[in-house]
From Swiss-Prot:
Reaction(s) the record says it catalyses: cyclobutadipyrimidine (in DNA) = 2 pyrimidine residues (in DNA)
Job of this protein: Involved in repair of UV radiation-induced DNA damage. Catalyzes the light-dependent monomerization (300-600 nm) of cyclobutyl pyrimidine dimers (in cis-syn configuration), which are formed between adjacent bases on the same DNA strand upon exposure to ultraviolet radiation.
Annotated GO biological process: photoreactive repair
Gene Ontology terms, MF aspect: deoxyribodipyrimidine photo-lyase activity; DNA binding
Family: Belongs to the DNA photolyase class-2 family.
Protein name (database record): Deoxyribodipyrimidine photo-lyase
Co-factor note (free text): Binds 1 FAD per subunit. Binds 1 coenzyme F420 non-covalently per subunit.
Transmembrane regions: none
SUPFAM superfamilies in alphabetical order: Cryptochrome/photolyase FAD-binding domain, Cryptochrome/photolyase, N-terminal domain
Keywords: Chromophore, DNA damage, DNA repair, DNA-binding, FAD, Flavoprotein, Lyase
Broadest EC class assigned to this enzyme: lyase
Organism phylogeny: Archaea, Methanobacteriati, Methanobacteriota, Methanomada group, Methanobacteria
The organism of origin for this protein: Methanothermobacter thermautotrophicus (strain ATCC 29096 / DSM 1053 / JCM 10044 / NBRC 100330 / Delta H)
Gene assigned in the entry: phr
Length: 445
């Protein structure tokens, strides 16, 4: 079922029945599996008695993206191309700005459909395309379980204020998505370049070692099936323990839209009691979408609540026992073996354990001479090395370390009333030296 709340017509145009096909402009939901936008596009093509093509604009100037991110993305595109062909749908990838690619193929289209992202640049792309098209552009939201405006009509203060609002909608939106059958395939059309020609020799602005994760829906489905069989119970008990191997590792795939959060939630619910997994997947993740969608300053320290900004500035002159430069932090050259291990995990694998990411961000605040500079450093490192950086979860995760979505705590030096974390807590809760040893082993491989 595709709920009406997921669907928005962006420009009020009517279909052009002279068009040769319907075009789905894929950007945020890079999958053929459980994709509301794709299924809506198939419905549209069938109703207009047209074939369907899918187009993707491969731009080399997405903010802060490097070869690590592009490699994962292209692996996912290769996977979705194969899956779309099995459904009679041709994927066209062109190396140009995403709106330009859509506008090119819209010239011979009857109607256009797209998915939904929440970052400013994604909104700008959609606005640019909608204003230039002579055919309808319909946006279908598929990367959240509850559509953002349905969950809340304002930026929420915390998970505590957001949770009751989203929970009241879950029963209605937690329903399977039926796969449609396309009546007219597009495999014989030749609208654009061959896929491998489009991605061959693609050069990202910055070269970085690939992550240990391979992109694509097929890989995501395999990893998640293993998680349900072997790790779900462990996750419910030990999700915060960086020593345990309990995580689903779905965040990179959710970031690129290569897996559906609705599919994950329904499969996990079928597998057993999993309130902690659903809390992170639905409440925490979709709170980050709420944050980015409604905040005008999600990528800067000014996004913080007034109390957090004020208390950090009240303590800006507090002496730091340790201060580190960006270069020292990036190279994991601090006095703290636990922080160094977390940074190295991110650099080597492309992903950091969630609990360690909280500790990591808190220490950057503690070891930098100004909170605004600390904020920028944390975002820079997160966006550069994390496969799942540069997205709502990443922005919200960094902001949380500085007081976003949290309450005021007892006042102390440097942090003021922002929540504090220290290595004693790591030692008390976990066998944290085993975590350090494991990351050291990765460095030796």
């Amino acid at each position: 079922m595709i709920h009406a709340e997921r669907i928005r017509n962006l420009n009020g145009e009517e279909p052009d029945l002279r068009g040769s096909y319907v075009v789905y402009w894929m950007q945020a939901s890079v999958r053929s599996h459980w994709n509301h936008a794709l299924e809506y596009a198939i419905e549209t093509a069938n109703s207009l008695k047209k074939p369907l093509i899918v187009v993707f604009g491969l731009t080399d100037d997405f903010p802060n993206a490097n070869s690590r991110h592009y490699r994962f993305l292209i692996e996912g595109l290769r996977d979705v191309r194969s899956n779309l062909r099995e459904r009679g749908i041709q994927l066209v990838v062109e190396r140009d700005s995403p709106p330009s690619v859509l506008l090119k193929y819209a010239d011979d289209a009857a109607a256009a459909v797209t998915d939904r992202g929440y970052l400013d640049i994604q909104k700008e792309w959609v606005d640019e395309a909608a204003g230039a098209l002579h055919i309808p552009l319909t946006q279908v939201e598929s990367n959240v379980i509850v559509p953002v405006e349905t969950a809340s009509d304002k930026e929420e203060y915390s998970a505590g204020t957001f949770k009751p609002k989203i929970k009241r909608h879950l029963k209605r939106f937690m329903v399977p998505l039926r796969m449609r059958t396309l009546k007219m395939d597009s495999l014989d059309l030749e609208p654009g370049p061959e896929f491998e020609d489009a991605v061959r020799d693609f050069r990202a602005p910055e070269d970085l070692e690939p992550s240990v994760f391979r992109g694509g829906t097929s890989t995501a489905l395999s990893i998640f099936s293993e998680f349900l069989r072997e790790k779900l119970e462990c996750f419910e008990r030990y999700r915060n323990d960086p020593v345990k191997n309990c995580l689903s590792n779905m965040s990179p795939y959710l970031h690129f839209g290569q897996i559906s959060p609705l599919y994950l939630a329904l499969r996990a619910s079928e597998a057993g009691e999993c309130p902690e997994f659903l809390e992170e997947l639905i409440v925490r993740r979709e709170l980050s979408m709420n944050f980015v969608h409604y905040s005008d300053s999600y990528s800067s320290i000014s996004c913080l609540p007034e109390w957090a900004q004020r208390t950090l500035m009240d303590h800006v002159a507090d002496p730091r026992e340790y201060e580190y430069s960006l270069r020292e932090l990036e190279s994991a050259s601090t006095h703290d073996p636990y922080w160094n291990a977390a940074q190295q995990e991110m650099v080597i694998t492309g992903k950091m354990h969630g609990y360690m990411r909280m500790y990591w961000g808190k220490k950057i605040l503690e070891w930098t001479d100004h909170p605004a500079r600390a904020y920028d450093i944390a975002l820079y490192l997160n966006d550069r090395y994390e496969i799942d950086g540069r997205d709502p979860n990443g922005f919200a995760g960094v902001a949380w370390c500085f007081g976003k979505h949290d309450r005021a705590w007892a006042e102390r030096e440097i942090f003021g009333k922002v929540r504090y974390m220290n290595d004693r807590g790591l030692k008390r809760k976990f066998r944290i030296d085993e975590y350090v040893d494991r990351i050291r082993g990765l460095m030796d491989e």
